[in-house]
Curated annotation (Swiss-Prot):
It comes from the Eukaryota. InterPro entries: HAD-like_sf, HAD-SF_hydro_IIB, HAD_sf, OTSB-like, Trehalose_PPase. GO terms for molecular function: trehalose-phosphatase activity. Removes the phosphate from trehalose 6-phosphate to produce free trehalose. Trehalose accumulation in plant may improve abiotic stress tolerance. It catalyses: alpha,alpha-trehalose 6-phosphate + H2O = alpha,alpha-trehalose + phosphate. Its EC number is 3.1.3.12. It holds the Pfam family Trehalose_PPase. This is Probable trehalose-phosphate phosphatase 10. It comes from Oryza sativa subsp. japonica.
């Protein structure tokens, strides 16, 4: 993803200009995540990132500008957002890939910048903060390297938080205490541990089944298996789909979902990033609290479950990170990780100012 430029032009905020652009936008519908891995679904979930700023004129792509009428920039709408947070505790939920780090061709190279790490650390010191990713929990921690956060890997099926913060995590029947390489005790909640042997078996089968496909990468994310096809020629995407489905059809307790140039095999259980948000709010003793404003920032279709939870409950805001116009359950948008970093900086600054005024 990339904005191909810095800052938002004043033209972006001109309601009259947006009205003029409205007829250029085709109706955008949030498509369901099909479970058959067809080529159509792979293309649908993997739109090509676009340059949303014209390098010569500095103006926004007209279709993207019109799209932001429905999903306003969270930076431009910042005062409106924090107005809802006045006097409330803000709970921050963040995706990793494409949100805190750029999307890269090699998944193992999705490195978080030192500047972003410091911004996230500062946010976590002032706000309860969690990272919810499709990656394995340990892998996300290896990227982020911050002990102040909650981590939810495998789309929220594997959750870790510092011991001593909130007892409700360890009191859950699926929770355990552990001492990890982070250097301190942690609380761990895991949904669907009975699926682990099955996931490991599918991982091995997929490595063997796809070994002849150039560019494919199979990733074991503990509670799910990811089949990355970002580096596969599009003419071979159907082959990736077929190999994945050939393995999956003998595992009725597993299902297939789509991410950005990735097929993901997960347990058939009622758990997703939205459920993880609800669980974490409960663990933070914020589930029934009216004085809380949850904010979820993510870029992937798997983040839609979290956006939907906040929207349906009318209790928080989802912010979609995208340079491509697409329908979403989010209420606001940001273009790329650089705008995410700016939003987080402003959020912490605002929270500090509010705290100083209340003293």
């Amino acid at each position: 993803m990339g904005s191909c430029g810095n800052g938002r032009s004043s033209e972006y905020d001109d309601p009259a200009s947006l009205e003029k652009m409205e007829e250029l936008v085709l109706p955008l519908k949030l498509m369901p995540l099909h479970t058959n891995g067809r080529l159509y679904d792979m293309r649908l979930s993997s739109p090509t990132a676009t340059c949303v700023i014209n390098s010569s004129s500095g103006s926004f792509d007209p279709i993207y500008r019109a799209w932001t009428k429905k999903y306003p920039s969270a930076l431009n709408a910042f005062d409106h957002i924090v107005a809802y947070g006045k006097g409330k505790k803000i709970a921050l939920f963040l995706d990793y890939d494409g949100t805190l780090s750029p999307i890269v061709d090699e998944p193992d190279n999705a490195i978080m910048s030192d500047q972003m790490r410091e911004v996230v650390r500062n946010a976590a010191l002032h706000l309860p903060t969690a990272i919810i990713s499709g990656r394995s929990r340990d892998k996300v921690f290896d990227f982020v390297k911050l002990t102040e956060l909650y981590y939810a890997g495998s789309h929220g099926m594997d959750i870790m938080g510092p011991v001593g913060e909130h007892d409700s995590v360890t009191n859950h029947r699926s929770s355990i205490n552990s001492n990890r390489k982070q250097g301190k005790g942690v609380k761990i909640f895991q949904a669907g541990t009975e699926f682990l042997p099955m996931i490991n078996e599918v991982f091995r089968l997929l490595i063997d089944k796809t070994k002849a496909i150039d560019g494919v990468k199979i990733e074991n994310n503990k509670f799910c298996v990811s089949v990355h096809y970002r580096n596969v020629e599009e003419k071979n995407w159907q082959l990736v789909s077929q190999c994945t489905n050939d393995v999956l059809k003998v595992y009725p307790r597993l299902r297939l979902t789509h991410g950005r140039k990735v097929l993901e095999i997960r347990p058939v259980i009622d758990w997703n990033k939205g459920k993880a948000v609800e669980f974490l709010l409960d663990s933070l003793d914020l589930a029934s609290c009216k004085n809380v404003l949850p904010i979820y920032i993510g870029d992937d279709c798997t983040d839609e479950d979290a956006f939907k939870v906040l929207r349906d409950d009318k209790r928080g805001f989802g912010i979609l990170v995208s340079s491509v116009p697409k329908d979403s359950h989010a209420l606001y948008s940001l273009i790329d990780p650089s705008e995410v970093m700016e939003f987080l900086k402003r959020l912490v600054m605002w929270k500090n100012e509010e705290a100083s005024h209340n003293k």
